[in-house]
Amino acid sequence: MYENKKPRLSSLSSGPELGGVMGIDLHEYQTTINSRVSLSGTGVHGGRAVTIHLNPADADTGVVFNCMSDGELVREIRALVSEIGGTDLCTVLGDPSGLHVATVEHLMAALFALGFDNVSIDIDGNEVPILDGSSQDFVDAIDQAGIRTLAGKRRFIRILKPIRIEKG
């Protein structure tokens, strides 16, 4: 495992240049957050106070939401298309009428934009806090924690022919 010393993500460019700055091709290797980050706020739809903790994760873990109750893991929900339970007003992972995590899109956008592959997220409610209503607070918090490049190589999907998606 390669460990970088808290690079300022916002001060670096993304893409191959980022790897050049650190001496590692971040496009080739998986990444995780360098240290734990905690954010608290209110769920925009439920109005409840919620805290999330973003934790480093091993290669090939992916993004995982750990639904917690009184400090105990109740359910693990992976951020996979197969886990999408609804998209009315927000993105819901899990069972919308049961255990789920809602309003994940701003956090997921920040993780994707910053190039993270593996993050374990502890959440003490069923909705990610809205914070400032964008991804900026997530980006700023992750920026403070830094990025860790893992030994596992990324896997890519190669699109071999045009794909067309239509509705209706």
Pin down the residues of each PLM region.
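C-terminal regulatory domains involved in ligand/effector binding and gene-expression control
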Residues: 2-117, 122-168
